[in-house]
Regions:
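Short amphipathic alpha-helical coupling elements at transmembrane boundaries
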Residues: 6, 10-14, 54, 58-65, ...
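Structural motif
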Residues: 50, 67, 91-97, 160, ...
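Membrane-interface junctions
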Residues: 14, 18, 29-32, 89, ...
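Hydrophobic alpha-helical transmembrane segments of multi-pass inner-membrane transport and secretion
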Residues: 21-50, 268-282
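Mechanotransmission and gating elements of multispan inner-membrane complexes involved in transport
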Residues: 174-175, 182-274
Length: 282
């Protein structure tokens, strides 16, 4: 029997001999119970926080790609097809899709909200996102070039009071230059449906439309970037470094941890503080 176990067993059963030994046995039992409860609390709290982090991360990655490749300044990428081919050559890359990213205002009557506009390719989007499941996938399938249809985040649709079949006004900051100044470009868009990712930041701001329609509205010659999906999301940092050295052209690369750096840093800090506090209790 190990020495530690033999010693602990001796003191926990010491109450059979004398009253003094019984007191020692009581103190030993209380100490062991306190340590057991402290360790249990430490394990439970860290497990809950790890589960919370994983759940939020999974919901976030249903909208955010593992890696984004984009041109600086929000400009169109010089050679999208070439970059797609080069990115797919990496063994960790299992999906790639072009996108357009821009900011705009979305209006319905007197209500107006700021929005993050993302132009997507509905055919390739299933390679990099989980938004194509169920009715959300049916809505994305209606994003046909030239039809100027949009799919709104569920919370954004509720704030504007719109639903499928309604018309909203998209106001782009890029417009025509006139003697009176720059006139914003205004386009009427048909709501094809909504999506709910479970992440408020995206559900309240994100607008999806076909990337060719987005290029016309924002006067771009092509997509502004490419989104990638990896076999192992935890390899995103190393894959991004590999691609930075192999891709042609002046491009920027960021992985999913960099896109949400503030949130993940806050969660990690909270986990460390809880671990320290519970360790002191134990």
């Amino acid at each position: 029997i190990p020495y530690e176990l033999a010693l602990g067993w001796r003191y926990t059963r010491a109450g059979r001999a004398t009253r003094r030994n019984g007191f020692i046995s009581f103190i030993s039992g209380v100490s062991m119970l306190g340590i057991a409860l402290g360790v249990a609390a430490l394990i439970i709290v860290l497990s809950v926080m790890n589960g919370f982090q994983k759940e939020v991360r999974d919901r976030m990655l249903s909208v955010v790609s593992h890696i984004e490749i984009f041109a600086p300044g929000g400009a169109a990428m010089p050679d999208v097809q070439r970059t797609l081919q080069e990115a797919r050559q990496h063994p960790q890359v299992v999906g790639a899709a072009p996108f357009v990213s821009a900011q705009a205002l979305l209006a319905r009557g007197e209500d107006m909200k700021g929005a993050l506009v993302r132009g997507i390719d509905p055919v390739r989007e299933p390679e990099v996102t989980d938004l194509v499941a169920g009715s959300q996938g049916e809505a994305l399938a209606q994003l046909v070039p030239g039809e100027f249809r949009v799919v709104l985040g569920g919370e954004l649709a509720r704030m504007l009071g719109v639903r499928r079949g309604d018309v909203v006004t998209l106001i782009a900051p890029t417009g025509q230059v006139t003697p009176a100044g720059v006139v914003p470009r205004i386009k009427q868009m048909l709501v094809a449906g909504t999506f709910d990712s479970g992440h408020y930041e995206y559900d309240s701001t994100l607008v999806l439309l076909h990337h060719e329609d987005a290029q016309r509205i924002f006067r771009l010659e092509g997509p502004t970037g490419i989104r990638l999906k990896l076999r192992n999301l935890h390899e995103a940092r190393s894959v991004a470094l590999d691609l930075a050295g192999s891709l042609s052209g002046d491009l920027r690369i960021r992985d999913w941890t960099q896109q949400n750096r503030t949130w993940f840093a806050a969660v990690q800090l909270e986990k460390r503080m809880m671990f320290i506090i519970l360790t002191l209790i134990v």
